[in-house]
């Protein structure tokens, strides 16, 4: 609490103790804006050798996508402004002869084929996606163009250029989705399963929010705190799963090593975090008292937003793997012909440039039973 010197009219604040409501490890660091991540020791001991299995270690990798936090840890942020910055970070650490930065769009099939032709990757980590839920709600055509048909371009290039393995970075928002972004990622998962078995091992990794990535709630809250508030939360009871950037990268690489083709992996995300509690903790970590120094404002759920996210659908179950933090989905195999025909129909609707029609076709696709038993 503030201690006031009445004569000098100064306010002194003691740093608040880190709350452990969402942080099971050591106290959260006091660094402004970037230090609110859990420490789960994912790089210690037994996790490292897992990346060396089944051809992951020392392979030529192509990680397309602007998934800023995750991609920066993998290799680079693939958008124009970030390319220069990440190149400056990588050069002194690795030397410019160990990597190559390429500017390209996954929607540009000709350019994408040129990149695959030039670099002949052994493994692809596909993280390219438009990922902001409210933005995609008002831009459904762009979401489908990028997240569905951009993904289709990547997968087909993997087959054409004999890539050994391709890992799609998916999201828990693909489960029982109520928003455009999640629906497009669910279609991407179906494409991964449908195109598997054509010479490339395709798999997907599904997880929640990445703490510290660009555009994350942590950055938003810190900016609002720096501005004096209010800190905005859409619902008092809203929860989300969170993972640190190093943890996410480690587990994605490990899942890639486990992949044999056709799997959807689910990561151990721990317990869901109440966003209101996260806001309260961050305010206190900044040396303020919630509700008095910095107010928390409940703004209401945004279009497409759910109060809680799920990791599996009703017709799915999970099984363990050799990695204690990685699980694999168990469900009926998909009907590949049905999926590809449905995606083709979606493309025909997309060409009409009718946003409502695209939205309707998209949700009709993800709500349809795409398993082989449908055709039996």
Regions found by a protein language model. Give the residues of each.
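Conserved Rossmann-fold NAD(P)-dependent oxidoreductase catalytic core, especially the SDR/UDP-sugar
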Residues: 9-13, 126, 130-186, 194-195
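Strand-loop microenvironment adjacent to phosphate/nucleotide-handling motifs in alpha/beta enzyme folds
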Residues: 33, 37-42, 154, 189-210, ...
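Helix N-cap at the beta1-alpha1 junction of Rossmann-like dinucleotide-binding domains, i.e.
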Residues: 79-82, 271
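Conserved residues in the N-terminal Rossmann fold of short-chain dehydrogenase/reductase
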Residues: 102-103, 145, 235, 298
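Conserved Rossmann-fold cofactor-binding substructure of NAD(P)-dependent oxidoreductases
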Residues: 102-123
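Proline-aspartate-enriched helix->loop->beta-strand connector
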Residues: 70-71, 116-125, 133, 163
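Flexible, Lys/Arg-rich cytosolic regulatory linkers and terminal tails that connect or flank
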Residues: 1-47, 159
């Amino acid at each position: 609490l503030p201690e006031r010197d009445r004569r000098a009219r100064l306010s002194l604040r003691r740093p608040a103790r880190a709350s452990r409501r969402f942080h099971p490890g050591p106290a959260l660091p006091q660094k402004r804006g970037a230090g609110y991540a859990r420490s789960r020791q994912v790089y210690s001991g037994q996790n490292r050798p897992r990346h060396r299995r089944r051809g992951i270690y020392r392979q030529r990798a192509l990680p397309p996508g602007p998934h800023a936090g995750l991609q920066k840890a993998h290799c680079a942020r693939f958008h124009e402004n970030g390319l220069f910055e990440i190149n400056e970070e990588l050069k002194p650490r690795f030397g410019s002869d160990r990597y190559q930065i390429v500017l390209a769009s996954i929607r540009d099939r000709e350019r994408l084929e040129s990149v695959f032709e030039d670099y002949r990757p052994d493994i692809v980590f596909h993280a390219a996606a438009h990922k902001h839920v409210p933005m995609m709600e008002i831009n459904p055509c762009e979401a489908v163009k990028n997240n569905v048909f951009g993904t289709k371009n990547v997968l087909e290039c993997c087959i054409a250029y004999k890539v050994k393995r391709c890992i799609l970075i998916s999201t828990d928002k693909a489960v029982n989705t109520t928003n455009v972004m999640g629906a497009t990622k669910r279609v991407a998962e179906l494409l991964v399963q449908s195109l598997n078995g054509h010479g490339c091992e395709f798999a997907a990794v599904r997880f929640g929010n990445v703490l510290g990535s660009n555009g994350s709630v942590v950055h938003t809250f810190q900016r609002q705190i720096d501005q004096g508030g209010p800190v905005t939360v859409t619902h008092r009871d809203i929860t989300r799963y969170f993972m640190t950037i190093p943890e996410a990268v480690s587990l994605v690489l490990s899942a890639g090593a486990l992949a044999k083709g056709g799997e959807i992996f689910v990561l151990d995300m721990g317990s869901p975090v109440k966003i209101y509690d996260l806001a309260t903790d961050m305010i206190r970590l900044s040396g303020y008292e919630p509700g008095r120094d910095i107010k928390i404002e409940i703004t209401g759920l945004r279009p497409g937003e759910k109060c809680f996210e799920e990791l599996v659908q009703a017709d799915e179950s999970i099984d363990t793997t050799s990695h204690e933090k990685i699980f694999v989905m168990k469900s009926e195999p998909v009907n590949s012909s049905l999926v590809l025909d449905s995606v083709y129909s979606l493309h025909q609707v997309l060409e009409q440039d009718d946003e409502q029609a695209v939205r309707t076709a998209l949700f009709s696709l993800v709500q349809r039973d795409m398993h082989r038993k449908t055709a039996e």
